[in-house]
Amino acid sequence: AGYLQMPMVGVTMFWSYGYYNQRIGEDGNVEVAYIRKHCDFLTDINESVEVEVYGEKVKVKAYKLEPGIFDTCPVYYLTTDIEENSEWARSISHKLYDGNEKIRIAQETVLGIGGIRLLQKIGYNFDCVHLNEGHALPAAFELLIRLKYWEKNLF
């Protein structure tokens, strides 16, 4: 999309520890390690939004992958792993494919609702939204709420 200069933007999660790293231990068995990821190529845009997750207000901070770095469209990375959040809220963006169902639903809520709120806050007006599988389904709910608000207040 970036190479073709398509008018697109991406939103994804910034996983503090990613999936996991593997290595073969001295005993010959596979060892799993969660190693904190650092991405110096992401820009802190000093923007955040708030999303309610299981009754807790969670601050969602955004970083941006600038289009020129990997010849992509702009991509915004969302994280909850910031000091303003509780330890539980920070863990929402720790691991990709977390086995805890409660965390997985929280991740989808942060990505979907937080993503829509961020894009609108920083000035994106969009006509089309692509949701990858059900992972960002809460985005559809956020858009529906906003549509009902505009219909009620404009017509």
Language-model features: locations:
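Catalytic cores of carbohydrate-active enzymes across secretory and cytosolic contexts
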Residues: 2-155
